């Protein structure tokens, strides 16, 4: 395997798509069901989490450079980072759309339907549009089928070009250096925050992970970052090495004089051109402010003549990012895909700010190989009761193993056989009810709640 940041590429045998069996037929997602004959011809590393594969951009570059391939839309922005990249991409989409741009946004993972990954003007791509694009890519690839992520990435490029969007936004899936989105020409690359994540692939130090994500900043291009300390030093050194302009939050742009109220947050945004603008973000969460600053700074540089709507800021669609639902019994259900120590700490801060003095019950499941003990340790200061269930959509840690560890930490815990029973057990608690640990879990709970609304 090629461990990013740890050594040279080593050629290895990867799993043949046919050997994975039929994975999408009878899926809960109707779009995946319709696309199953195409999807089952691809390797899906999000589901397999294999220990061996070769990392490079040759496959996606081959698709992007094929004859009659679409010319990628410009301007385009790529968003990388351990924390906040999805929120930053969502702010780019929401503010750009409200300012009059027709946006195309590519993100992952999806919560309910894979069509969510490719959005045009805020709406998921229609399966009727996606199907012929994927079919064409697979026909071209022949006996060298792309991975699921590679195919969806190139499909996003094609769909944005066909629709003639004004702004393309690409969220990195994993890392940066060898992520499929890095094969696309962009006008700005954003690196949000860096933390220890995917250490088996990206490296086990902040410096190593920062080095992988810094690679999204192109030679002679524009980079923006909200990193600090060691991560910032690595990113700054990379930008200098490749001759890129780097804008740093807290130095070249930022958020100032924040005034919190029940209905949101008001303050000042400093922009790269030295100006300041007032903003009001309705229903603001603390973790959203760096994302807002990054998005506004990037848009102001790429569209200097565009009047950005900041008072109020248009709220982005952020499902399962501290999404609060009021249930039939009056209890509060909070859905969040946070699964790392830092992101869960941000959730804890928000719970304490909004619901002081309460003790939430937690429904969780975590992906295999994650630093799950460190992640759950962040939640223990506010919660002492947990329900642990199986993770669907990607390999997960054994719920019994997680429960045993929680018991050792002095918390009460029980295993639920599936997400539905886990939600029932969670609802036995008056609230708040907190769902964290995985976007797959949060999305599954969201689907259950919506289907019984």
Give the ranges of each region predicted by the language model.
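Short functional linear segments
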Residues: 15-17, 23-81, 88-99, 106
């Amino acid at each position: 395997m090629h461990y990013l940041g740890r050594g040279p590429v080593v050629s290895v045998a990867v799993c043949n798509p046919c050997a994975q069996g039929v994975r999408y037929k009878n899926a809960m997602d109707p779009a995946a069901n319709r696309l199953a004959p195409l999807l089952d011809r691809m390797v899906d590393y999000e589901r397999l989490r294999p220990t061996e594969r070769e990392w490079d951009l040759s496959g996606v570059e081959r698709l992007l450079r094929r004859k009659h391939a679409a010319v990628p839309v410009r301007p385009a922005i790529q968003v990388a980072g351990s924390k906040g990249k999805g929120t930053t991409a969502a702010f780019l989409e929401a503010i750009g759309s409200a300012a009059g741009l027709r946006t195309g946004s590519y993100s992952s993972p999806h919560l309910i339907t894979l069509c969510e990954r490719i959005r045009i003007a805020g709406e998921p791509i229609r399966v009727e549009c996606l199907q012929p694009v994927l079919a064409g890519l697979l026909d071209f690839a022949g006996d060298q089928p792309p991975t699921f992520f590679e195919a969806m990435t190139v499909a996003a490029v094609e769909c944005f070009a066909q629709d003639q969007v004004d702004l393309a936004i690409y969220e990195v899936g994993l890392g940066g250096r060898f992520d499929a989105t890095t094969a696309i020409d962009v006008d700005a690359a954003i690196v949000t925050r860096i933390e220890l994540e995917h250490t088996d692939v990206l490296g086990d130090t902040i410096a190593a992970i920062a080095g992988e994500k810094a690679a999204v900043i192109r030679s002679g291009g524009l980079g923006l970052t909200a990193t600090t300390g060691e991560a910032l030093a690595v990113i700054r050194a990379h930008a200098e090495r490749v001759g890129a302009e780097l804008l740093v939050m807290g130095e070249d742009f930022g958020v100032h004089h924040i005034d919190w109220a029940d209905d949101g947050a008001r303050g000042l945004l400093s922009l790269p051109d030295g100006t300041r603008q007032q903003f009001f973000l309705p229903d603001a969460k603390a973790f959203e402010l760096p994302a807002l600053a990054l998005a506004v700074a990037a848009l102001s540089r790429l569209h200097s003549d565009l009047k950005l709507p900041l008072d109020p800021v248009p709220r982005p669609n952020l499902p399962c990012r501290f999404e609060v639902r009021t249930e039939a019994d009056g209890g509060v259900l909070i859905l969040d895909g946070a699964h790392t120590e830092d992101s869960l700490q941000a959730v804890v801060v928000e719970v304490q700010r909004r619901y002081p003095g309460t003790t939430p019950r937690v429904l969780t499941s975590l992906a295999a190989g994650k630093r799950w003990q460190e992640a759950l340790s962040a939640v223990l200061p506010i919660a002492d009761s947990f329900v642990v269930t199986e993770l669907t959509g990607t390999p997960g840690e054994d719920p019994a193993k997680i429960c045993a560890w929680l018991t050792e930490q002095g918390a009460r815990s029980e295993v639920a056989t599936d997400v539905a029973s886990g939600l029932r057990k969670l609802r036995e608690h008056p609230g708040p009810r907190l769902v964290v640990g995985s976007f797959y879990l949060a999305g599954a709970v969201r689907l259950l709640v919506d289907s019984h609304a």
